[in-house]
């Protein structure tokens, strides 16, 4: 690796974050959607067609590398300035869910390059896709329920944890070689989609080679090492921590781009265990590398890529602790940077070492520093095992999004797909389905006498819950139109060529949320 002074990479990471926070426009997602409009329909197979549009997007998407980057890659092009709860224009009284999947086009400010006509053309195309038409039918059917949020549903993208471990160890070329002789559109789509990350790496390498021509010596040393790294990964497996982080970032970038715009809450999983096989340096150096890794997850002026989670610690099936040196290096990176994203979570159990608690103490007793979310790994083992999770998968329990426990690479819990609003249901029970806000009749239910309100409330809750389940399943069926051949490579599809049928899903249990 290139030589650097202690703290030099930390300073670069902080400067890189400052540059990211200065970004006020996010246009890459629009370019991705426009590319889909221009290139889709070439193949009869929807799976292969989606893989081709992903590859074409990677070929033309504008790329850049800052003088403060030591790793190339960004997830900026997958997100829009849209997420309600961190959007300054968000008003609670106007929220009724995410009913219009093309509303994201309101979040791009027209200018000379992205004209109103250009935006309108892509939006009109998207409105006529199978995905949007199916989803619009669902929202229209249940509009009276969601109008004032007796419940709301979401068309969930993201919200799971890919398993990149095989790719990190063996490289993408071996994955392509392992699937090229298998039959089926799914295999052809995954083979094509995997080529996207190679194309992306080559494009970044060309940028670095151009920057190298007139770079000062210190930066030239960094650029030469970065170029050398991209000659190795993602084609072949990582040999050390630097290569592993770089490869992970590129895989993540393509995965998010495949589900643009706004694949919220994709999460890393047990990062300490993912990177432990590649730990080839000291803790201080690893910390500075992971500081750059953490900056990667922050998008523009409000860190728009929300609820991406990294978890540390935990146990194996015998109860032995799995903490390692990478655990503490990542903790140090989190503490030093104190960034708004990604979320830090930790798994605790009866054999968690004292050193782990001591390292957490600096988060808990330093004012103004983020604090990790705590998860009882012993309890998670028992609960998920009782719900059908295989024992061999339990050490891979990780958190996707805010607090949703999933199995890395095997579990699409579809979390945040539906939210039941019990206070609103109570209101409608008391009023006989009439809104206290507008006076409008929202539901065909009778007004409950106060002396019998509990029984009627439970009956109405069951009524709305059943309707919510039907609506939520409708949203999931709509999302099934959005093929994800690249992501499927890291969710079990690589082994069998399966892109998952939403009508015949045999994964782990799903759940709903309450508000």
Give the positions of each predicted feature.
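Low-complexity, highly charged intrinsically disordered N-terminal segments
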Residues: 190, 201-204, 209
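Alpha-helical bundle segments that constitute or directly flank the non-heme di-iron/ferroxidase center
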Residues: 195, 199-201
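A conserved hydrophobic secondary-structure block that centers on an alpha-helix together
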Residues: 212-215
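Conserved catalytic cores of very large enzyme subunits
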Residues: 2-193, 218-515
């Amino acid at each position: 690796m290139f030589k650097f002074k202690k703290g030099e990479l930390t300073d670069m990471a902080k400067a890189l974050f400052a540059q990211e926070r200065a970004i006020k426009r996010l246009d890459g997602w629009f370019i991705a959607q426009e590319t889909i409009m221009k290139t889709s329909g070439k193949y009869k197979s929807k799976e292969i067609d989606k893989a081709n549009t992903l590859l074409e997007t990677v070929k033309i998407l504008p790329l850049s590398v800052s003088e403060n980057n030591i790793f190339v890659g960004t997830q900026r092009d997958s997100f829009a300035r849209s997420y309600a709860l961190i959007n300054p224009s968000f008003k609670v009284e106007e929220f009724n869910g995410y009913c219009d999947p093309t509303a994201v086009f309101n979040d791009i400010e027209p200018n000379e390059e992205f004209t109103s006509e250009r935006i309108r053309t892509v939006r009109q195309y998207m409105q006529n896709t199978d995905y949007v038409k199916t989803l619009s039918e669902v929202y229209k059917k249940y509009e009276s329920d969601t109008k004032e949020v007796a419940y709301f549903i979401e068309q969930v993208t993201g919200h799971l944890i890919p398993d990149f471990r095989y790719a990190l160890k063996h490289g993408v070329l071996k994955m392509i070689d392992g699937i090229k002789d298998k039959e089926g559109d799914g295999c052809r789509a995954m083979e094509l989609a995997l080529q996207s990350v190679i194309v992306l790496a080559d494009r970044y390498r060309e940028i670095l080679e151009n920057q190298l021509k007139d770079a000062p010596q210190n930066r030239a040393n960094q650029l030469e090492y970065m170029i050398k790294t991209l000659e190795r990964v993602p084609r072949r497996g990582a040999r050390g921590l630097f290569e592993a982080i770089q490869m992970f970032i590129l895989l993540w970038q393509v995965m998010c781009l495949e589900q643009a715009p706004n694949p919220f809450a994709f999460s890393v999983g047990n990062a300490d265990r993912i990177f432990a096989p590649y730990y080839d340096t000291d803790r201080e150096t690893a910390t500075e590398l992971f500081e750059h890794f953490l900056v990667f997850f922050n998008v523009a002026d409000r860190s728009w890529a929300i609820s991406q989670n990294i978890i540390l610690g935990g146990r194996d099936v015998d109860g032995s602790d799995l903490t390692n040196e990478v655990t503490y290096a990542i903790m140090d990176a989190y503490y030093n940077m104190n960034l708004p994203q990604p979320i830090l979570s930790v798994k605790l159990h009866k054999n968690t070492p004292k050193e782990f608690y001591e390292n957490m103490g600096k988060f808990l007793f330093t004012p103004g520093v983020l604090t990790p979310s705590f998860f009882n790994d012993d309890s998670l083992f028992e609960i998920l095992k009782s719900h059908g999770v295989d024992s061999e998968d339990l050490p891979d329990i990780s958190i996707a999004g805010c607090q949703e426990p999933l199995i890395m690479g095997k579990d699409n819990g579809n979390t945040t797909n539906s939210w039941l609003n019990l206070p609103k249901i109570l209101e409608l029970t008391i009023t006989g389905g009439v809104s206290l806000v507008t006076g409008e009749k929202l539901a065909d239910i009778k007004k409950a006498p106060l002396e019998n309100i509990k029984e009627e409330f439970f009956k109405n809750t069951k009524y709305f819950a059943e309707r919510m389940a039907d609506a939520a399943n409708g949203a999931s069926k709509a999302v099934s139109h959005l093929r994800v051949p690249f992501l499927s490579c890291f969710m079990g599809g690589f082994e069998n060529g399966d892109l998952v049928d939403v009508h015949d899903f045999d994964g782990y249990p799903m759940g709903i949320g309450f508000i």
